[in-house]
Each structure stands twice: as C-alpha cells, then as structure tokens.
C-alpha cells in the first residue's frame, strides 16, 4: 500500500512538473509571438516611411493603441480569408487629432512585396505619400504562409 501511494505521489509530481513546463512554453510562445508581431509592425512601417522619404514626405509616427485595432482587423481578414476595409474608419479615429484618414489593406507572401504592390496601386500609393498624413497604425498577421496587413493613416 505504501509503495502504491509513493508511486502515485511520484506520478503526480511528474504530471505537475510536466504541466509547469507546458504552461511555461505557452507563455514563452505568446511572448515570442507578440515580439514577432511588433517586429513585423515596425518593419512594415519602416517600408512605408522609406517610400515616403524617397518622395520627400515626413515620417509617419506609429500610434500603438490604434495599431491594436489594425492587428485585430488583419486577424479578422486572415480568419475570413478575404480583404475588407474598416466599415467606419471615422469611429476608429474618434478622439484623435485628425482631419483626414485613409486605410490600406492587403495580403501577400512578404511584407516587401506587399509594400511594392501598394506603391503600384494608385489609391494605395496616394495614401502612402499623402502629405496630410503624419501618423499610422499598423497591424500585421501571418497566417498560412501569407501576411495580412492593415495600415491606417491619419493627420
């Protein structure tokens, strides 16, 4: 009987240790994913700002709070499997100092190719290079090998 209890305690200890390891890995994965999302967001904004600099436009400053919405929007598009614009962009910009807003959404195999496609599209290019814009919110999600991007511009 004592051997059975000792064995049960050892098994419970092993199970607890395994659970702790699995939970720690989940937390690490979440942190790594968040870190990767931030790097992708920063990279996409740098591509946009590089294009603006080549056309003597001011650098866009990132709105991190609005970027959470942009990320949510990108995730929705990836989940649904198609592109769509924010239904009411004005409501998302409420409370910000703005008079003009715009949005680019896209999906592509790389962020570089996606920025290139934006620059070849007249309405997207207009948003990227618009003088009145001074802020941007960026959301990037990778799903099934593709990058789903939402960039909200305002100024």
What is the role of each PLM region?
Residues 14-25:
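Bacterial N-terminal signal peptides
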Residues 46-50, 87, 99, 119:
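A generic alpha-helix surface/boundary motif
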Residues 67-115, 128:
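Short, surface-exposed glycine/acidic/tryptophan-bearing loops
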């Amino acid at each position: 009987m004592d051997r059975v209890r000792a064995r049960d305690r050892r098994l419970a200890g092993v199970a607890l240790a395994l659970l702790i390891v699995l939970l720690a890995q989940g937390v690490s994965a979440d942190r790594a994913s968040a870190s990767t999302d931030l790097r992708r967001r920063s990279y996409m904004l740098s591509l946009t700002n590089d294009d603006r600099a080549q056309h003597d436009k001011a650098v866009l400053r990132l709105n991190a709070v609005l970027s959470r919405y942009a990320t949510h929007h990108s995730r929705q598009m990836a989940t649904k499997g198609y592109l769509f614009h924010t239904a009411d962009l004005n409501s998302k910009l409420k409370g910000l100092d703005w008079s003009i807003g715009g949005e680019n959404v896209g999906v592509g195999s790389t962020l570089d190719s996606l920025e290139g496609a934006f620059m070849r599209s007249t309405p997207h290019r207009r948003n990227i290079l618009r003088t009145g814009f001074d802020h941007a919110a960026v959301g990037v999600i990778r799903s099934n090998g593709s990058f789903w991007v939402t960039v909200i511009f305002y100024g």
